[in-house]
């Protein structure tokens, strides 16, 4: 069965965010329905970082990018959400 691989780029809503705590909150909100395969930090500047979230889901109407974005938008410390990349993959 094919799967969908997503990469989301999220930016914090404030400068003094605890990135390790934010990563745990993101994983806690998305999983188990949306398994997080990794979260990378990307330096933006002046100590501010973006987080790149890697998610792989089954290809199904039950799993949507709209739902992922809705979940992420409800996290207090997230100020911006961008679907940076997605593709269909087969294993």
UniProtKB/Swiss-Prot annotation:
<comment type="similarity">
    <text>Belongs to the EF-1-beta/EF-1-delta family.</text>
</comment>
<dbReference type="InterPro" id="IPR036219">
    <property type="entry name" value="eEF-1beta-like_sf"/>
</dbReference>
<dbReference type="InterPro" id="IPR014717">
    <property type="entry name" value="Transl_elong_EF1B/ribsomal_bS6"/>
</dbReference>
<comment type="function">
    <text>Promotes the exchange of GDP for GTP in EF-1-alpha/GDP, thus allowing the regeneration of EF-1-alpha/GTP that could then be used to form the ternary complex EF-1-alpha/GTP/AAtRNA.</text>
</comment>
<dbReference type="GO" id="GO:0003746">
    <property type="term" value="F:translation elongation factor activity"/>
</dbReference>
<dbReference type="Pfam" id="PF00736">
    <property type="entry name" value="EF1_GNE"/>
</dbReference>
<keyword id="KW-0648">Protein biosynthesis</keyword>
<keyword id="KW-0251">Elongation factor</keyword>
<dbReference type="InterPro" id="IPR004542">
    <property type="entry name" value="Transl_elong_EF1B_B_arc"/>
</dbReference>
<protein>
    <recommendedName>
        <fullName>Elongation factor 1-beta</fullName>
    </recommendedName>
</protein>
<dbReference type="InterPro" id="IPR014038">
    <property type="entry name" value="EF1B_bsu/dsu_GNE"/>
</dbReference>
